[in-house]
Every structure is written in C-alpha cells, then in structure tokens.
C-alpha cells in the first residue's frame, strides 16, 4: 500500500499553491436512499465484514479483480468496517467525499478519502453539500494526436493511497476533459496523472506495476493541474522521477511518444512553449520558454499558466522512428525487455496509536 506520508506527488511539490474557491454543488441523494436501491449489495457487505462498491452516480469501479472490489484502493485492501474507502469518478470529475477532519496533507488522514464504512457495514456520506462525484473546472483537455493507439492518463488517488488507479482513456484522434480541481477540493490539492504510451491499456496502465514495462508508475511522463481563485489554471508536464532512477532498466531509453501543452488562445497562456519531444529532447530534457525546472526526484518539468478561465491542452503525439538524438535508442512501449525486474508489492499495514 502506498502511504501519502511516504509518496508525495512529485508535481504537488512544484505546482503553484492557490487560495480558496467556493462552488455550489447540485443536491445529492441521501445515503439512505442510495442504500435502499442497493439492498442486496448492502446485506452482502455486512455479512462479509466489508462494504461493497455501491455504483452511486458518477462513480467508476477500478481494478475489480483484487480484494479492493472496485474501490480506488490497493488490490490487497478491502473496504472494511471502520475504514475510509476512496473511489474513482468519470473523466473530468472529482471525488466529492472525504474525512472532514482531514484538512492537511499529513499521514494518516491524507488517506481518508471517499465514503466511510462504519461498524455496521453502512456507507456514510460525510460531505452532504457535495455530490459523490462533481465536475472539475474543465480547463484542461487531454488530446491524443498519436496514430499508434489509445492513451491512458492515470490519475492518483488523493486523499487516498496515491496509486495511479483513476482512468481516463483518450482514443486515437480524440480528446477527453481532465479533472482540474479548484481550491474547494481536498486540502486545495491538485490532480496528478501518469501519462502512458499509446497502445497501453487502462487495465495495464492504471495500476502499480513493475520495471518489466514503462507503464503505470514506471511511465515516462507525469502531468498535473489545478485552478486558483483568480481563474488561473496551472498545467504541468514533466519526466517521471521513477523512470530516471538508477535501477530503472529504461532510464536511458527515449520514449516513442512526446507530450506538450498548447492553448486555444495563446494570448491567455504564459509559459509556452512547454514540451517534451524525444526527437529533439534527450531523457529528462524539456523545451520551455523559462528553461524548465527540476522537481523532487530530479525530474525536469515545465508549467503553463492559462489565465481568465482559458483552456489548455495536454497533447500526446508520436515521435518519428528515425529519432536518435544524443545517441539514446527509442523505446517501443510494447517491447519485451529482458532484464532484472523490480516489482512493487502491496502490503496493507494497520497502525495502532498508543494512548
């Protein structure tokens, strides 16, 4: 299990902090009404000592093959009595429920996202003024300009264990709105995505993986965004520090795809150009008007500010097969790499505080 105390999102350390945003959420059904419509699931959950995934409006079950049962949790972790159970929402939407007493990015409360599974097996909705899922700011669009396949943008779960479990699949030649939080979101935090190579499925990409393939937490690129109270959207793209680690078998391998930020109205955007194009950039290089910056773990990145509610795009594109700058070979994301494999294992740990 990934602990928020130990795995701070790399972009959260570098993205600009913002103020407070006020929004009016649409009325949401009471928890009792929803439980009645899922009575069979509810009774089964009580007998098993867990709360079953409820499929409330906008919620998306993820990685359903594990003990998590669709909740946005580690595959070995159940939504058990007395625990908080985070969940994924549809693309462009944010989780609207979390522990009201968890107001800062500190362990262990930074994991208390989602619904509370009480001692009777009932799911409690803590924030009655918010829907289970609600629309983000809608100011960042993921565009897939690659011809080599669909692209999985995998959002980390926060508040939660920060694994990249929340899927947004962008078909070749299409686009999807990404979830952009305002300052009304938990602890005024931003959204964080791992951007996978075209052709890697959501099932393979949006889970904690291993060094056998450059996907999931080993994907080459990360991205993030949030909006402040002045309608400024901050959008970041950068290299994934895990991809650059000395133990990573492809740390010197240039990806077969690139990523860049563009704006529909460039007059409203500051920080352009902001791109990573492996046909001209080496590993851990970015092209930026400000020269780029280096974040936690040594991953270089660039940030664009879209003002006055303007929209920005995170575009994924193919790199020409002849790319060979700086002598680093290009990686086909579906290549089989013969190497020593490092695999991240999950282990859920219960911490008991002494009184």
UniProtKB/Swiss-Prot annotation:
One of its GO terms (cellular component) is membrane. It is found in: Membrane. The chain crosses the membrane at residues 6-26. Keywords: Membrane, Transmembrane, Transmembrane helix. It is a single-pass membrane protein. Belongs to the SUN family. This is Uncharacterized protein YMR244W.
């Amino acid at each position: 299990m990934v602990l928020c105390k130990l795995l701070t999102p790399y972009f959260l350390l570098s993205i600009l902090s913002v103020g407070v945003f006020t929004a009016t959420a649409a009325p949401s059904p009471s928890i009792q009404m929803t439980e009645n419509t899922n009575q069979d699931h509810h009774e089964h959950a009580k007998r098993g000592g867990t709360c079953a995934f409820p499929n409330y409006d906008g919620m998306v079950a993820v990685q359903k093959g594990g003990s998590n049962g669709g909740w946005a949790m580690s595959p070995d972790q159940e939504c058990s009595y007395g625990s908080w159970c985070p969940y994924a929402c549809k693309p462009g939407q944010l989780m609207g429920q979390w522990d009201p007493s968890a107001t800062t990015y500190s362990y262990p409360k930074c994991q208390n996202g989602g619904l509370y599974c009480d001692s009777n097996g009932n799911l409690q909705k803590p924030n009655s003024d918010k829907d289970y899922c609600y629309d983000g700011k809608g100011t960042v669009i993921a565009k897939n300009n690659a011809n080599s396949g669909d692209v999985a943008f995998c959002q980390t779960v926060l508040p939660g264990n920060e694994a990249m479990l929340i899927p947004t699949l962008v078909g070749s030649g299409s686009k999807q709105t990404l979830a952009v939080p305002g300052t009304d979101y938990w602890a005024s935090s931003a959204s964080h995505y791992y951007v996978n190579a075209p052709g890697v499925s959501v099932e393979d990409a949006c889970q904690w993986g291993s060094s056998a393939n450059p996907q999931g937490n080993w994907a080459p690129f990360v991205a993030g965004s949030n909006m402040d109270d002045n309608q400024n959207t901050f959008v970041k793209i950068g290299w994934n520090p895990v991809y650059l680690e000395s133990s990573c078998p492809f740390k010197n391998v240039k990806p077969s795809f690139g990523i860049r930020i563009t704006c529909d109205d460039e007059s409203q955007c500051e920080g352009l150009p902001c791109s990573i194009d492996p046909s001209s950039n080496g590993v851990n290089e970015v092209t930026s008007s400000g020269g780029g910056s280096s974040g936690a773990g040594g991953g270089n990145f660039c940030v664009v500010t879209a003002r006055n509610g303007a929209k920005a795009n995170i575009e994924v594109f193919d790199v020409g097969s002849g790319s060979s700058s700086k002598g680093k070979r290009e990686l086909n994301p579906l290549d089989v790499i013969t190497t020593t494999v490092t695999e991240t294992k999950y282990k859920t740990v219960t911490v008991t505080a002494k009184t």
